[in-house]
Amino acid sequence: MKLFLDTNILLDGYFQRTGAVASDAVIAKCDGTTHSGWIAWHTLSNAFYLVRGHSKSAPTALQFIEDILSWAELAETTKADAQQAAGSGMKDFEDALQYAAAIACAADVIITRNTADFKTSVIPVMTPEEFLAAFP
């Protein structure tokens, strides 16, 4: 199953946020056997920016990115996908880009903490906890 992970799922563990255990459990399932983990290209820059700002260390942020790249696949998107996102009517453009990337990689499910932002999605949207309950 192709799991498309929103940026917030990748950052839960680093920032030790509520729900980090479930997010990390979903990431652990992205081992390429039963499930593969997919992210948008721009997730890398967003994650780098946030981790560097928190840690005040570019090397720490780069290591975080390298860790992601050790298991994640990148959704291949095009100009047309970006245009679709821009014209989608979604309130948050970054979420629209995430959604366009999930469609581009033919994701089976989008895993996010912001399920309300994806209410018009044709792809099922779940929190990490919902996913783990449905696919233990």
Question: How would you name each of these model-derived features?
Answer:
Residues 2, 71, 103-136:
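Acidic, PIN/NYN-like endoribonuclease modules and their adjacent C-terminal/linker elements
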Residues 6, 95, 114:
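Acidic active-site catalytic centers that drive phospho-/nucleotidyl reactions
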Residues 24-92, 96, 100, 121:
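PIN-domain endoribonuclease scaffold, especially VapC-family toxins
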Residues 1-39, 53-60, 129-136:
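Short, well-structured N-terminal submotif of metal-dependent ribonuclease cores
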